[in-house]
Structures are given as structure tokens and as C-alpha cells.
A protein has these predicted regions:
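Charge-lined substrate channels and their catalytic hotspots, especially those that engage the 3′ end
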Residues: 1-123, 132-177, 209, 216
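Short coil/turn segments at secondary-structure boundaries
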Residues: 53, 67-71, 86-89, 196-200, ...
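Short, surface-exposed charged micro-motifs
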Residues: 107-109, 185, 264-266
Length: 326
């Protein structure tokens, strides 16, 4: 709700017409024209980047970390191999994300299962950054993460859940760097039915950072040009093979494919909005979705088996109006 206010001069902050400022009202009540003091200048309404700042303040998203949290993140030591952490650095795990992705927090790998009783089946590994290795319950990093709940992404910036030494450092699965991870190894048959899974902590080294478009283009080219020696093509073939099996299982159980367009905001070099368009949906997107859904199913089954308390997200039966709308 908009309200007219008289802005008091500030001793150290100068502002002009069109500036966006955060204010504090000095009087009580609902007078037509209230008095207010400037607390902070966010930017000018002609600057499109100010929209992100308005949203940050409107939703009270924390942008600074405590000194204790920064100290913990800065002094983080890399994870080492031990009895509780397997060595996956010889496995060709890769990260697959959008071209504008800022964080690389999951990696995938697949190969044909060589066991005789699972002909044409697949072995899959899904690995995520082992954040729990660095963030301990109740420490300063944990407290800061609880304030945020998640990282928040804007077209021109990201407000990370953890200090950048972790979010863009030890917890980012960057290529050719050793990283602690939590992994699940899964075996499926040729119809995409899960036969087994096992969770473990590991040390991994991503072999490449691939975009969805690059993976799809590489796979499509490989399909046409058999015998390619391209490294990414060699990784793409088994990934798509496992995806095809999982997609078969999806169709068998009657899962719905509800395509909700995701918008992509493109900025120019000045940070101004240049274009807004639908993100293209490729099989490479669906591949990652199927792998992540499978990993989540494995996690849910493991927690259930161990009798650990867990919050499950269960979709309620849709109303008739929603079904009709669909």
C-alpha cells in the first residue's frame, strides 16, 4: 500500500527525485502525510538492478553473515579420504546445469550394468555436495542457514545461504577440484525398475561442467555420427541410456508430464533487462529431473527403513476446479 510521506533531510545520505530509499516513520498514526527519515538508499528507479534490492528488503532477506560464520567458512579445511569416505575421483562424474547457473551442487554418472542377471540394466551415481561436512548442528553457519532456508536467485545476483567461501568454494562441485560429496549408487533394470541402492560419503572430482544445451547437442550429434571419440559424447550415451529406461518406468506407472514454462530474464552488460523468454525444455533437463527424483526416492526409502523421522511432501488430491482447469 502506497503512502505519501515527507522525507526529512539526512546528514550523510544525499538523495534526488527517483531515488529508492528505505525509511522509518517518525510519527504514529495514519495521517495523510507522515514524516519519515531515510535509513538507506537502495538505488534509482531508472536502474533496473534496484528492483532486486527492493525485493530483498521487502522480503527481509538477510544479505550479511555474522563474523563467526564468516570465520568458520574462511578457515574451512578440505575433506580428506578416511574410512568413512570413499574415493570416487576416478569416476567420470560431471555437473549439468543451465548456462547461467552460479552453483554446481550435484553431479551424475551412468554406465551399463555388467552383471549377468541384469542384462541391459544400468548403474547410476548421483552425488551432491556434502554441506554437512562443513556445517555442524548449532554452529554459526547452521544458524545463518536457518535464517535463510535457501539461496535466493535474482537475474542480476544471488543471495547465498552460506558464505561464498563455502557456497562458491568447498560446496561447489567445480571441475578438476577435489570435493566432499554424499553419493548414492543405484542399479536399475532395462525397464527402469530400481533393483538396489546404497548411500555413502565420498571424495569426488568433477570431470566437466556441462550445460543442458551442450549435453543435448553432443548426444544428438553422437546419434548421427557413430564412433565419435569426444569425451562428453562417451559420457552422454550411458546417461541417456539410463534416462530412457527411467522414462519407460515413468510411462508405465502413468506419471503426468505437466510442462510449466520457466521464464529466463536476460540482462545486457549494464545489468538492464534485455529480453524475457521461455527456457527451452530439452531431454537433458528431463534426464537430470529423473535422476534427482530417483535419488530422492532412494533417500525416502532409506529414511523409512532406518525409522528416522522425516518430513515428506505429499500432494493432496486436487480439487475438481483444478482438474477441470488442467
Amino acid at each position: 500500500r502506497s503512502q505519501e510521506a515527507f522525507i526529512q533531510p539526512h546528514p550523510s545520505i544525499s538523495f534526488l527525485d527517483g531515488d529508492i530509499v528505505k525509511v522509518e516513520f517518525n510519527d504514529i498514526g495514519r495521517s495523510i502525510r507522515r514524516n519519515a527519515s531515510v535509513l538507506e538508499k537502495l538505488g534509482n528507479q531508472k536502474n533496473s538492478q534496484s528492483v532486486s534490492l527492493i525485493s530483498i528488503h521487502e522480503h527481509q532477506i538477510p544479505t550479511e553473515f555474522s563474523a563467526d560464520a564468516i570465520d568458520l567458512a574462511t578457515n574451512t579445511k578440505p575433506a580428506m579420504l578416511d574410512d568413512n569416505r570413499r574415493d570416487l575421483r576416478n569416476i567420470d562424474l560431471i555437473t549439468i546445469d543451465g548456462s547461467d547457473a552460479r552453483d554446481f551442487d550435484d553431479a551424475v554418472w551412468a554406465e551399463k550394468d555388467q552383471t549377468k542377471n541384469n542384462k541391459d540394466g544400468w548403474r547410476i551415481i548421483v552425488a551432491i555436495a556434502d554441506v554437512a561436512h562443513y556445517v555442524k548442528p548449532g554452529d554459526a553457519l547452521d544458524i545463518e542457514a536457518k535464517k535463510r532456508g535457501n539461496s535466493v536467485y535474482f537475474p542480476d545476483r544471488v543471495i547465498p545461504m552460506l558464505p561464498e567461501d563455502l557456497s562458491n568454494g568447498m560446496c561447489s562441485l567445480r571441475p578438476n577440484e577435489d570435493r566432499a560429496c554424499l553419493a548414492v549408487q543405484i542399479t536399475i533394470d532395462k525397464q527402469g525398475k530400481k533393483l538396489s541402492h546404497k548411500f555413502f560419503r565420498a571424495l569426488m572430482r568433477s570431470k566437466a561442467r556441462i550445460t543442458y544445451e551442450e549435453l543435448q547437442s553432443t548426444f544428438d550429434s553422437k546419434e548421427k555420427e557413430q564412433g565419435s571419440e569426444d569425451f562428453i559424447a562417451k559420457l552422454a550415451i550411458p546417461l541417456y541410456g539410463a534416462f530412457k529406461a527411467l522414462h519407460t518406468a515413468r510411462l508405465t506407472r502413468g506419471a503426468l508430464d505437466i510442462e510449466v514454462p520457466e521464464m529466463q530474464v536476460q540482462l545486457d552488460t549494464n545489468g538492464d533487462v534485455e529480453n524475457i523468454k521461455d527456457r527451452e525444455r530439452l531431454d537433458s533437463h528431463r534426464l537430470i529431473e529423473e535422476f534427482m527424483v530417483l535419488a530422492n526416492v532412494c533417500a525416502a526409502e532409506t529414511l523409512e527403513e532406518k525409522k528416522y523421522p522425516c518430513v515428506y511432501r505429499v500432494h493432496d488430491v486436487p480439487s475438481k476446479d483444478k482438474i477441470d482447469g488442467l
